[in-house]
Regions:
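C-terminal motif of bacterial Sec signal peptides marking the signal peptidase cleavage site
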Residues: 17-20
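Bacterial N-terminal signal peptides that target proteins for export
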Residues: 1-8
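Extracellular/lumenal and peripheral-membrane lipid-interaction modules
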Residues: 22-197
Length: 197
């Protein structure tokens, strides 16, 4: 092995080691960050724009049938754009994280109600992140029974057209890309609504 090959190999190994340490540091920083869901835009369930619906009479018969069948079969699909604010403990350091998959759950009055998985890559950074997502939506189950009561509470809250942040908790559990492969975070991260000023 020539002197230049040895130096090149040594520099390459140092770069890989530094990159791995940086990604581990970034992963820790994102785990310790504060998350705030700022906005949800263009929420569609099975292709139906539910943000424009004010009540049951606003749905066509086919839209209602499609949604009811999907809820009954636990095959509901959602697409939306989330605006997620990430506040790092050390904002002066530039960090980013690639999420390869993200489990999520929605709690209504502290009770797990809906859950799903986003299976497309997303990139997070400090600040406001615009995240267009498509996801499955299933009802949570306890002892084999679906949580229809939680879904009913959610529908009642939505129909009241008021601030839902006191009743809803959104949690995420991302799987992130690291130098040694994909790693799922060990627990859910609570994504609160915007902080009041």
């Amino acid at each position: 092995m020539s002197k230049y090959s040895f130096i090149y190999t040594l520099l390459l190994a140092a770069a890989v080691l530094f990159s791995g340490c940086k990604q581990a540091s970034d992963l820790r920083a994102f785990t310790e960050a504060n998350y705030s869901l700022q906005e949800v835009h263009d929420l569609q369930l099975n292709g139906v724009d539910v943000m424009k619906k004010r009540g049951p009479n606003d749905f066509t018969t086919s839209e209602g049938d499609s949604l009811l069948a999907s809820i009954s079969n636990n095959t509901l699909r959602a697409s939306t754009t989330l605006y997620l604010q990430v506040h790092m403990q050390e904002p002066e350091e530039v960090r980013q994280m690639t999420i390869t998959e993200m489990k999520w759950q929605l709690l209504v009055d502290g009770e797990e109600t809906l859950q799903g998985v986003v299976q497309e890559p997303m990139h997070l950074h400090d600040g406001l992140n615009e995240l267009p997502i498509q996801t499955s939506v299933t009802m949570t189950e306890t002892e084999g029974m679906r949580n229809y009561e939680g879904l009913s509470k959610l529908m009642t809250l939505l129909s009241q057209k008021r601030d839902l942040r006191q009743n809803l908790i959104f949690q995420i559990k991302p799987t992130v890309q690291t130098p040694v492969g994909e790693v799922e975070l060990p627990k859910y991260i609570t994504v609160s609504g915007p902080r009041s000023s």
